Amino acid sequence: MSAVDTAWLRMDGPAGAMMIVSVMATATPVCAAELRRVLETRLLCFPRFRRRVEADPLGASWIDDGDIDLDAHFVVTRLPGKGGKHELQALAARLAAERLDPSRPLWQIHFVERYGSGSAWILRLHHCYADGIAMIRVLLSLTEQDAGPAQAGAQDAESRAGQRRDQGTTDPPPLRDWINQFSQPAGDILEHALAEGARLLEAGVHRLFHPDTAATVALQASGMVGEFAKVLALPDDPASPLRASLSGEKGVAWSEPLDLQEVKTVSRALGCTVNDVLMATVAGTLGAYLREEHEFDTAGVVLRASVPVNLRAAEEAMTLGNKFGLMFVDLPVGVANPLQRAYAMHDTMRELKGSLQPQLTLTVLGTLGMLPAVAQGPAIELFSRKGSLVASNVPGPQTPLCICGQRISEMYFWVPQSGSIGVGVSILSYAGKVFFGLIADRACVAEPQRVVDRLGPEFEQLLLAATVGALGLEQRNRATKSAGKPRQRKRRATPTKARRKTRPPAGNT
């Protein structure tokens, strides 16, 4: 097992295990037997899903599990009562707090054959197997492109998989498109971090055999050292209801999805990125929750979020494991004005462009994974005190996908919270919608639904403010252009008294 994956394995603590949790749903029912066949043919082809973990104080190893018992990993269950959203959230929360069986490969799917008018399933995967991006890649490998009800219903899972093999492809077009999209450098952050990381890794090997180049290596590493000093100098996040002694009891909730086009409308109107708009909406939601539910004075308060940043090169997009770093992002929860909050978020993200924090944290995790397990806990706690939540934003495929011939209508995921952090926010865009989810230790957020219910209204306020502001700006621009044009006097015959009209008073036109 790699050092970084080992570090994630060791982060399990009394308050919970480091599991990624995903919930997906279809509007029409999926057959359990057919989904099981899909798992056999498409999921178990990943060797890591057939392997269990064997750990010792110095590291961990992957052990082949032989003939894997799929029945232990694919559990068919029923929801109590009405079998709706509330019941599915309760099941997801319970499973998020339960540990996976360490004697087996560390993943499990609970399939709900009847959820509303369709079906749903909850995937749990230990973070040492894959990060969020890799997990979504695995989930998408189980799907196929939405080809319409008639065609989708006519083909079963095995024939669709065989069809792709005959065409010489291993993944459906939406997955390849998504991988290509996500593997593009996400602004200067990834581009700079990848370049610097590659230089440092190469220099690290070279200096073992060429001590005379130590000065050059030191210059190349100075940026990383400086970034490390900045991170260490960050103060602990301020005390708030979101930081409490963790209980280990989880709560899960999600909101109604936002329209991605409306989010893009706001981003264009404000000159911000889509990510700026979404993170500003999260900040506004948390601020409103703290003020209204806890009577917490947020004036001037900034809470820090730990944000995962993908560091996979394009050629590594199809591999499992952990290839991401973390970045500490200030959330302006104390800014009540939605426009000011969006601009503050934009300024924060702009200042972080070119930051080496993602590569730095990946390097730190790799180092911790190579040290004895006893040394890891204090270091993780040191970093976790600098934030109040984990916020993950993943751009998913915009082409609708199907599984077992049924269209996927909802898609949520949550990454684990390490150390003393007890709140996690997830953002996933899929098929023209933006899905928000919240997972939290009950000691930090007793009722997560009370948080996510505020997200829609917060975005509506931002949308309205941006729209009104854009209209006002357009009117001012038109007036400015009109005032700047010289008037041309037209010659005309002097009107007769019968044709004269009274000019409207100035200001009424």
Language-model features: where?
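Soluble acyl-CoA-dependent acyltransferase catalytic core bearing the H(X)4D motif
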Residues: M1-V4, D12, A17, V21-I421, ...
